[in-house]
Amino acid sequence: MSKTVVRKNESLDDALRRFKRSVTKAGTLQESRKREFYEKPSVKRKRKSEAARKRKKF
């Protein structure tokens, strides 16, 4: 979990920007979206192989 402490004389906008950056860097939002719904193992494998195929293409 990302935690941001507001520094002395720091605006709320700056603290929010730092928090958003830390959440993005940690991948918290992507992880929660990925786990929002159950994904069958066969669908996971298919998605993973398609992503590998896309990466290989370029």
Curated annotation (Swiss-Prot):
Biased composition (Basic residues): 43-58
InterPro entries, A to Z: Ribosomal_bS21, Ribosomal_bS21_CS, Ribosomal_bS21_sf
Presence of the UniProt keyword Ribonucleoprotein in the record: yes
GO CC annotation terms, alphabetical: ribonucleoprotein complex; ribosome
Region (Disordered): 36-58
Biological process according to GO: translation
Similarity comment text for this entry: Belongs to the bacterial ribosomal protein bS21 family.
Official protein name in the record: Small ribosomal subunit protein bS21
Species the sequence originates in: Streptococcus uberis (strain ATCC BAA-854 / 0140J)
